[in-house]
Every structure is written in C-alpha cells, then in structure tokens.
Amino acid sequence: MTQPGPSTNTGPEFVREMARSFWYSAILRAAIKLDVFALLEDRALTYQEVADSLGASPRYTQAFLDCCVVLELLEESTGKFTNSSNASSFLVKGKDSYVGDHALHHTNTWVSWGRLDEVIKDGKTILPFETGFVDPDTYWTNYMTGQHNRATSGQSRQLVENVDLRDKRNLIDLGGGAASYSIALCEANRQLKAVV
C-alpha cells in the first residue's frame, strides 16, 4: 500500500494508484464503524489487544492496523498502536471536531459511484439505499449527523465570524436539519430567535 494523495507518477502507476484509491476510504470507513479511534484514544494497544476488544481476527486486525498506520490514521511504536493527532482530533466520537459521520455518509455512496457509467447513460441518479448498500434509515441518519459534524467541526464558527446579525432579531432556517447553524448563530447573537 502506498501513501494516498496526488500521484507524481506519469506511467501506468498513475492509473493503478487512482484505481485503488477507494481502498483508503474503505479503511477509514471500517475504522469508524469498528470504533477503533475511541478504543485507541489516550492508550496504546497491541494488535492482539485490539482484535480481542473487537472480537476480530488477530491476523486481519494486524494487517488492518498496519494499513491505518500507512494512512497516518494511527501510529505504531514497539508493537503498540495509538491514534494519530488527526484521528484523535477528528475521528473520536463525542468530540466537537468529530467528522466520522460525515465520512460514513460519503462512503455510503460507493455503490452509486461504482455505477456512474449507468447514471451517465441513463440520466438517472441512483440513491445509495436503492442499491442495497445501506438502508434508508442508515443513509439519512449518517447524512444528518454528518451535516451536524460539518457544523460543529468548524463551519458554524466560520459562519458566525462572517455573517453579521447583531441588528437582527429573527431567523428562519429552511431545511435546517439538526439546527446546528441556527444554534451557533443564536449563541453568538443572544437577541436572535430562530425557527427551524
């Protein structure tokens, strides 16, 4: 496995790297779904300890954790694995900066993207839950919590910093989802009342 990102190859490796790039998001998705980052937050574990905690195959767990190291999701020292600073900041559930649900939402669309040739020819969108990859409840839950992740991980702060509502009293938020942005705007502008 090689490091993700833009390839500097100009030969056939350029095509090979592009073709296998979805592996990286598959590794990220698995780590999020297995809650590996919560398990390794503030502690170092061997692959066997991780496998035991997950009830997983030690052999496959070791290979998986090694891939996470290559992708800089985890760090390894003397046979023990810990979160990288990015994983600790953005992939541990419960932190305001968590964006794991947003990543799950994107990976829920794999099968649809895998059929892009059909979409182009037929001119019809294929929704992820129409493919059977995820059920509608999971898709929409990941979508909504993913949008909330975006807000709490910095976008709502940017909105507050760039929109002056000091002289406004009312806000109507159409399509406001979890009201993440409205909450941030109202907290920054105490006179503001929002209807979502």
Regions found by a protein language model. Give the residues of each.
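Conserved SAM-binding motif I beta-strand of class I
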Residues: 193-196
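Conserved SAM-binding loop of SAM-dependent methyltransferases across substrates and taxa
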Residues: 178-191
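Preference for long, well-ordered alpha-helical segments
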Residues: 139, 177-178
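Conserved Class I S-adenosyl-L-methionine-dependent methyltransferase catalytic core
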Residues: 2-5, 12-33, 38-44, 52-53, ...
